[in-house]
């Protein structure tokens, strides 16, 4: 699962938002959309590379991402072993605030753009139906807001360390649970997301998700639904 954190407010606030996420894949396998991965059914042959993409939208933002992963060594993606992953994302968002003028503070609407790249290395553990992945790497992010918001520190370009953990549990052939968390030092962004999914077919799944996310400027909650296409 991959989730970007946007700077939506000039002052720290708490917020609950709802949205819909659509994820899909091309190539050999699918990886679910805060750079998060997914799993596949064990009866399929395990490939060594994967390509994934996704899109999500809410009331004040929309974002998309693309990425790829590779399993090092002789084992495939669904077996224990070392992993490499690269992800790029782009998003646009809008929020309301205020600007200081000669006549005092006046209401203003800010439009933001966020571009993000990350390169990670990690290891996948597998015990029965449970898969756990641990990643670490570097991230680069650029936040651009128009007009410039002097009250928002999440602007400009930054490099940082990224840490990430992913878990996936097949409850049954139809149902699965996932729980993921990440933290990046570029703008001190964090994300934690849990999902309950239902496989309608081998190529289509849907379900519910909820979690928390934020950065050095704001904290928020998220609840919504998702669709997954293999």
Residue ranges and their predicted role:
Residues 78-189, 210:
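Outer-membrane pore/translocation modules
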Residues 38-103:
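Short glycine/proline- and aromatic-enriched beta-strand/turn motifs that initiate or cap beta-hairpins
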Residues 11, 20, 25-28, 38-39, ...:
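Intrinsically disordered, low-complexity regions
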């Amino acid at each position: 699962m991959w989730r970007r954190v946007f700077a939506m407010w000039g002052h720290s606030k708490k917020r609950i938002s709802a949205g819909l996420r659509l994820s899909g894949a091309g190539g050999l396998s699918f990886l679910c959309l805060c750079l998060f991965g997914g799993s596949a059914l064990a009866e399929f042959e395990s490939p060594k590379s994967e390509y994934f993409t996704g899109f999500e939208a809410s009331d004040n933002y929309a974002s998309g991402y693309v990425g790829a992963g590779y399993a090092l060594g002789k084992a495939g993606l669904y077996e224990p072993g070392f992993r490499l992953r690269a992800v790029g994302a782009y998003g646009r968002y809008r929020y309301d605030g205020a600007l200081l003028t000669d006549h005092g503070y006046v209401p203003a609407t800010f439009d933001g753009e966020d571009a993000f790249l990350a390169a990670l290395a990690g290891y996948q553990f597998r015990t029965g139906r449970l898969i756990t992945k641990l990643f670490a790497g570097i991230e680069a992010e650029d936040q651009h807001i128009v007009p410039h918001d002097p009250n928002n520190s999440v602007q400009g370009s930054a490099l940082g360390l990224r840490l990430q953990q992913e878990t996936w549990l097949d409850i049954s052939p139809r149902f699965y649970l996932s729980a993921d968390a990440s933290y990046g030092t570029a703008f001190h962004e964090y994300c934690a997301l849990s999902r309950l999914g239902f496989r309608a077919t081998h190529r289509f799944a849907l379900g519910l998700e909820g979690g928390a996310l934020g950065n050095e400027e704001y904290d928020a909650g998220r609840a919504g639904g998702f669709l997954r296409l293999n």
